[in-house]
Amino acid sequence: MRHLWLLLLLCVFSVQTQAADDDYDEPTDSLDARGHRPVDRRKEEPPSLRPAPPPISGGGYRARPAKATANQKKVERRPPDAGGCLHADTDMGVLCPTGCTLQQTLLNQERPIKSSIAELNNNIQSVSDTSSVTFQYLTLLKDMWKKKQAQVKENENVINEYSSILEDQRLYIDETVNDNIPLNLRVLRSILEDLRSKIQKLESDISAQMEYCRTPCTVSCNIPVVSGKECEEIIRKGGETSEMYLIQPDTSIKPYRVYCDMKTENGGWTVIQNRQDGSVDFGRKWDPYKKGFGNIATNEDAKKYCGLPGEYWLGNDKISQLTRMGPTELLIEMEDWKGDKVKAHYGGFTVQNEASKYQVSVNKYKGTAGNALMDGASQLVGENRTMTIHNGMFFSTYDRDNDGWVTTDPRKQCSKEDGGGWWYNRCHAANPNGRYYWGGLYSWDMSKHGTDDGVVWMNWKGSWYSMRRMSMKIRPFFPQQ
């Protein structure tokens, strides 16, 4: 049964194939070179007839005379003097022309005259028709001429109007060139002289300011008498106002200025880093990060004390000393450009000395910002996330490469690409010392090296959002009541 079905299918396929082959038409002869050319409606315009001129009118040949038929009798033509009446005496011959003779002569001449008159009437009618057409054409030409005359007159009026306007403009330009431009030149010359003097004054002021800024900036404000080893000791001694104080962690070193936060979470915080307005450049070398830079505090509404923190980095030597005095906790606070705030608190925070490249260690995280220092960027997974962990890293600046990016290319360095000094791995999940971007959001084409070099905390806002404010504060760890 299966073999029968296969044989049937083969027969059907053969018949269909033969039928398909029969459907092909025989090839047609090639187009005759002198034949028509079909119009391609997709590419060509359809052919159109040209308008024909009117036929020529007027007189021509006269009508042809009718030919005599064979059975018609041939009329004997006789001279006029042979057509008169006969005399009674045949010998006398033909009489002189009489009424009968004149009548016959007139009858003989009437037919050709009527034919000529009819032909003349036709010619007159043709001339009349032609004259009528000519008159109409002349009338049309006359109307067109009148319209052209009116148009020419209108154009002359427009030309006269524009000529008047152009003349007024020419007079105005002449007056402006002759009167106003010299005056304006004198005014501009005076303005340029004034600008030149202002520029010279600004250059002098800039030179003086640059000379003034060669040394660290100082703040003119009163410093409280109360002091201590750090801000926690100061608050225990009665210093309850958040402002700039003098601390002396060790009697072997001179006291130095710090800003103490006496309000946040029971106070006693020593501010070691603060970003708030981009007024200080954090893209610095190793030595400035070692010693510290920026403005510790500023006056608040012309008060005598410095109640507002400035933008600064306290200095790695000072931070290392403060954290190695005993157990230290770290509080990192940040604020976006909408005013929302989060924080990251680490119960343990230590920075080693310069010989150990200021190695950092943190633990005991809690907070709302995300554990960027210990866990790395939460958006990444696996090895990529591990590369962004900061805990255990050495401190790096663009002139001292200690990051975790192992490469022989000196251009590939985290501190160079990310805008500041920090405990970079390869490279960061947090970048508090990065470039300050107003407005928060920024993109790779806005950055210097096409990298996320802003004031970043990836676990909260990602790589391409720079914080409005970020501060780092430390305090000796002690049990809270």
UniProtKB/Swiss-Prot annotation:
<dbReference type="GO" id="GO:0002250">
    <property type="term" value="P:adaptive immune response"/>
</dbReference>
<dbReference type="GO" id="GO:0005198">
    <property type="term" value="F:structural molecule activity"/>
</dbReference>
<keyword id="KW-0964">Secreted</keyword>
<keyword id="KW-0356">Hemostasis</keyword>
<feature type="site" description="Cleavage; by thrombin; to release fibrinopeptide B">
    <location>
        <begin position="34"/>
        <end position="35"/>
    </location>
</feature>
<dbReference type="GO" id="GO:0072378">
    <property type="term" value="P:blood coagulation, fibrin clot formation"/>
</dbReference>
<dbReference type="GO" id="GO:0043152">
    <property type="term" value="P:induction of bacterial agglutination"/>
</dbReference>
<dbReference type="GO" id="GO:0071347">
    <property type="term" value="P:cellular response to interleukin-1"/>
</dbReference>
<dbReference type="GO" id="GO:0005938">
    <property type="term" value="C:cell cortex"/>
</dbReference>
<dbReference type="GO" id="GO:0062023">
    <property type="term" value="C:collagen-containing extracellular matrix"/>
</dbReference>
<dbReference type="GO" id="GO:2000352">
    <property type="term" value="P:negative regulation of endothelial cell apoptotic process"/>
</dbReference>
<dbReference type="InterPro" id="IPR037579">
    <property type="entry name" value="FIB_ANG-like"/>
</dbReference>
<keyword id="KW-0399">Innate immunity</keyword>
<feature type="disulfide bond">
    <location>
        <begin position="414"/>
        <end position="427"/>
    </location>
</feature>
<keyword id="KW-0732">Signal</keyword>
<dbReference type="InterPro" id="IPR014716">
    <property type="entry name" value="Fibrinogen_a/b/g_C_1"/>
</dbReference>
<dbReference type="GO" id="GO:0031091">
    <property type="term" value="C:platelet alpha granule"/>
</dbReference>
<dbReference type="GO" id="GO:1902042">
    <property type="term" value="P:negative regulation of extrinsic apoptotic signaling pathway via death domain receptors"/>
</dbReference>
<dbReference type="GO" id="GO:0051087">
    <property type="term" value="F:protein-folding chaperone binding"/>
</dbReference>
<keyword id="KW-1015">Disulfide bond</keyword>
<dbReference type="InterPro" id="IPR002181">
    <property type="entry name" value="Fibrinogen_a/b/g_C_dom"/>
</dbReference>
<feature type="disulfide bond">
    <location>
        <begin position="231"/>
        <end position="260"/>
    </location>
</feature>
<keyword id="KW-0175">Coiled coil</keyword>
<feature type="region of interest" description="Beta-chain polymerization, binding distal domain of another fibrin">
    <location>
        <begin position="35"/>
        <end position="37"/>
    </location>
</feature>
<dbReference type="GO" id="GO:0009897">
    <property type="term" value="C:external side of plasma membrane"/>
</dbReference>
<dbReference type="GO" id="GO:0034116">
    <property type="term" value="P:positive regulation of heterotypic cell-cell adhesion"/>
</dbReference>
<dbReference type="GO" id="GO:0070374">
    <property type="term" value="P:positive regulation of ERK1 and ERK2 cascade"/>
</dbReference>
<dbReference type="GO" id="GO:0050714">
    <property type="term" value="P:positive regulation of protein secretion"/>
</dbReference>
<comment type="subunit">
    <text>Heterohexamer; disulfide linked. Contains 2 sets of 3 non-identical chains (alpha, beta and gamma). The 2 heterotrimers are in head to head conformation with the N-termini in a small central domain.</text>
</comment>
<keyword id="KW-0094">Blood coagulation</keyword>
<feature type="glycosylation site" description="N-linked (GlcNAc...) asparagine">
    <location>
        <position position="384"/>
    </location>
</feature>
<dbReference type="GO" id="GO:0005783">
    <property type="term" value="C:endoplasmic reticulum"/>
</dbReference>
<feature type="coiled-coil region">
    <location>
        <begin position="149"/>
        <end position="213"/>
    </location>
</feature>
<comment type="function">
    <text>Cleaved by the protease thrombin to yield monomers which, together with fibrinogen alpha (FGA) and fibrinogen gamma (FGG), polymerize to form an insoluble fibrin matrix. Fibrin has a major function in hemostasis as one of the primary components of blood clots. In addition, functions during the early stages of wound repair to stabilize the lesion and guide cell migration during re-epithelialization. Was originally thought to be essential for platelet aggregation, based on in vitro studies using anticoagulated blood.</text>
</comment>
<keyword id="KW-1064">Adaptive immunity</keyword>
<feature type="disulfide bond">
    <location>
        <begin position="221"/>
        <end position="306"/>
    </location>
</feature>
<dbReference type="InterPro" id="IPR020837">
    <property type="entry name" value="Fibrinogen_CS"/>
</dbReference>
<dbReference type="GO" id="GO:0042730">
    <property type="term" value="P:fibrinolysis"/>
</dbReference>
<dbReference type="Pfam" id="PF00147">
    <property type="entry name" value="Fibrinogen_C"/>
</dbReference>
<dbReference type="GO" id="GO:0045202">
    <property type="term" value="C:synapse"/>
</dbReference>
<dbReference type="GO" id="GO:0005102">
    <property type="term" value="F:signaling receptor binding"/>
</dbReference>
<dbReference type="InterPro" id="IPR012290">
    <property type="entry name" value="Fibrinogen_a/b/g_coil_dom"/>
</dbReference>
